[in-house]
A protein has these predicted regions:
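Non-transmembrane "mature" sequence context
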Residues: 1-119
Length: 119
């Protein structure tokens, strides 16, 4: 086996790890994450989400939410969790609930991207 083969990255495994890490920081359970990406929480335990799948696309959007929020609050994890659980007049609800639908997830992400643009 060559060195290149030994270091080949499995994108599906990396995506699950990134999703689980983002969810942990945002105060989300595996059940919550499963609701966002449309999979049972047991699917997350198996450790693979194909990036090109519908679930993979939703996982990538949630990771973008995490990254945008991280920038806005300077990485303060307590503030990130607070923001997710606080009613937001601009997004029209609780972000932690809104992200469980595709429309809500995109609304929250668009809001965060717009706020980041003001920095």
């Amino acid at each position: 086996m060559s060195l290149a083969q030994a270091h080949q990255v499995d994108k599906a495994e990396v995506l699950v790890e990134a999703l689980l890490n983002a969810g942990k920081v945002l105060g989300m359970s595996q059940g919550d994450l499963g609701a966002v990406i449309g999979k049972e929480r047991s699917a997350l335990s198996r450790g693979r989400i194909e990036p090109d799948s519908k679930s993979g696309e939703l996982a990538l959007l949630l990771i973008r939410v995490y990254r945008a929020l991280y920038v806005l609050v300077g990485g303060d994890q307590a503030q990130m969790r607070h923001w997710m659980r606080t009613e937001n007049l601009h997004t029209g609800g609780l972000p932690s609930v809104q992200i469980k639908s595709v429309q809500g997830l995109t609304r929250v992400l668009e809001y965060l991207d717009a706020m980041r643009g003001k920095l």
